[in-house]
Amino acid sequence: MIQMTLIQIDNYGPWTVTPRPRNESDLQILQAELYADLERQFANKKGLVFFTRFDNLLAVTNGIDEEDHLRIQRSIRNRYPITISMGVGAAETPHEAQKLATIALQKEGGAQSSKRKEILAIDSLAPADENNLVQAAHIDINSVTETLTDIESAFDTNFMVNKAQHYLMTKLIKKGALLFFIGGDNFMAPCNGLSEKEIEDILVEINDEIGIGLKAGIGVGRNMEDAAYMADLGLEEIRDHDNGMWTWVIEKEY
């Protein structure tokens, strides 16, 4: 079972234009600093935050309980000009878990409601036992430096990376998995419920459809930090074998 947390800036849209529109650079700085701050705090509890839309962030939070979430909310309130609300949900697939988290928060009021502030809406928490594991795939583009970065313009390379992301997201969401861009040519996919063969089939399909070669290290652990690190190690194994396989699975031993 995987646990997801939705983090939403309270009443953010109206705040950005009150009493007058704020400088765009200031808003970008606020969003970037808030993301880094949240990443640091959730990482201290072995979670992982994805910036998603910056005013709405998603995190994999297995092992992070109600009090942990409340402490993070208080910390943000004390140091920022905004507050955050959170929804938490746990399910067999990441897509279903984030859906439960979203619905729980939506029931407490709209994102731009002036009456909703610093809500923690918990639908469900994943039990903290050895049977509740997180599975994540770290996916990247094969030889992106040689095939894109060093020969195409920066924006055209970015376009191709976004194209790969779009195809991956479209196919993974149908299987109940999620996908997030994590920099460079890298993507992280919380993917509880998917087999190695299903992930490989998706990578093969994308290569056939748009000619972009991909590989995936797949990690399994009791929390997202461990799962992501195992996925990183799996990706290194593929690189060490000259990208000769599509996937490599590593499960953390405890």
From Swiss-Prot:
Kindly give the Gene3D superfamilies that the UniProt entry links to this protein. 3.30.70.270, Nucleotide cyclase
- At the top level, the lineage of the source is Archaea
UniProt keywords, alphabetically: GTP-binding, Hydrolase, Nucleotide-binding
Offer an example of a GO molecular function term for this protein. Answer: GTP cyclohydrolase IIa activity
As its record notes, the protein acts as a catalyst of: GTP + 3 H2O = 2-amino-5-formylamino-6-(5-phospho-D-ribosylamino)pyrimidin-4(3H)-one + 2 phosphate + 2 H(+)
First-level EC class: hydrolase
EC code(s) of this entry: 3.5.4.29
Task: Check the record and name the InterPro entries matching this protein.
Answer: GTP_CycHdrlase_3, Nucleotide_cyclase, Rev_trsase/Diguanyl_cyclase
State the Pfam families in the record.
GCH_III
Q: Name one GO biological process term.
A: biosynthetic process
Function of the molecule: Catalyzes the formation of 2-amino-5-formylamino-6-ribofuranosylamino-4(3H)-pyrimidinone ribonucleotide monophosphate and inorganic phosphate from GTP. Also has an independent pyrophosphate phosphohydrolase activity.
Q: Which family does it belong to?
A: Belongs to the archaeal-type GTP cyclohydrolase family.
Read off the HAMAP family from this record.
GTP_cyclohydro_3
Q: What is this protein called?
A: GTP cyclohydrolase III
- Species this chain originates from: Methanobrevibacter smithii (strain ATCC 35061 / DSM 861 / OCM 144 / PS)
